[in-house]
């Protein structure tokens, strides 16, 4: 559909010429409908079109082609049938073009060099780069790391809202939630007690489900917690398939940071102490010997 080519009427020999014509036509169409960056038109499209190699389509198996078609190719959604503006080789060259927009010298030669790596499958960029390079939203990073502080503003803005925008453009999320006070922690502003991190992680989980990655795959996120946090046991239950669904996060992964001191205590069969993070504010930023010293001080 991207090439407007018929194997019976047009023959295999004409395939390269159809690629060249479709390449220029569909780049212009992508810019026209607001899917592609207009700076792509500044390239020497004739030179890039001559570099296209339709025989490299044979590098794909059926599953690879179908995945590319379903998730990665630029779609013209202004048409009734949601026509693809790309085939595999137009896809590779578009990604290559998007990665050299800021280059000033020998851009086309560099694009062709990168395209050659892509088409031969000797190299492949991450999914966000393949989704977004050359588009109006050229977010190319795969993953974002963040830390949530112990206040409602940080939790709701950094931990939920900002992550939604990052997930929207296919960014994976990994965040530290240790600083958020655990269950039973005193809240001075309301004279109440904290419900811990679990309800907020449930919000983050639902945000990953609600704001998927450009409509092409589900959101991806992982929450990290240190071993001394007093909500650790509830945290370790989050991925279970049974129990209260309000305290389960099926869309979000979890990870537990384990310090050397914990393993030393385990080996020696000694006690391990849990803390509410607001009561041990320095602990989260320490590691190694400094962590061990401060942890033991807090235990006293």
Task: Outline where the language-model segments fall.
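Extended catalytic cores of very large enzyme megasubunits
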Residues: 1-300
């Amino acid at each position: 559909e991207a090439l407007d080519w018929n194997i019976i009427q047009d023959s295999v020999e004409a395939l390269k010429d159809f690629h060249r014509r479709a390449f220029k036509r569909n780049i212009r169409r992508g810019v026209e409908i607001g899917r592609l960056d207009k700076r792509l038109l500044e390239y020497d499209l004739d030179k890039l079109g001559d570099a296209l190699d339709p025989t490299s389509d044979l590098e794909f198996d059926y599953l690879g082609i179908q995945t590319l078609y379903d998730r990665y190719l630029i779609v013209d959604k202004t048409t009734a049938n949601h026509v693809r503006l790309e085939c595999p080789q137009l896809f590779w060259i578009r990604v290559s073009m998007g990665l050299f927009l800021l280059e000033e010298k020998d851009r086309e030669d560099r694009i062709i060099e990168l395209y050659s790596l892509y088409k031969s499958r000797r190299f492949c960029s991450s999914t966000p780069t393949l989704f977004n390079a050359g588009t109006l939203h050229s977010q190319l990073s795969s993953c974002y790391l963040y830390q949530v502080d112990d206040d409602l503003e940080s939790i709701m803005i950094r931990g939920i809202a900002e992550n939604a925008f990052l997930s929207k453009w296919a960014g994976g999320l990994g965040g530290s939630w240790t600083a958020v006070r655990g269950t039973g922690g005193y809240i001075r502003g309301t004279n109440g007690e904290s419900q811990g991190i679990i309800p907020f992680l449930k919000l983050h989980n639902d945000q990953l489900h609600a704001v998927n990655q450009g409509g092409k795959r589900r959101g991806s996120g992982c929450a990290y917690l240190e071993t001394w946090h007093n909500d650790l046991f509830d945290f370790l239950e989050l991925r279970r398939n049974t129990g209260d669904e309000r305290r389960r996060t099926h869309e979000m992964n979890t990870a537990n940071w384990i310090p050397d001191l914990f393993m030393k205590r385990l080996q020696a069969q000694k006690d391990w102490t849990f803390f509410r993070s607001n009561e041990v504010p320095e602990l989260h930023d320490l590691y190694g010997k400094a962590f061990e010293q401060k942890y033991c001080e807090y235990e006293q």
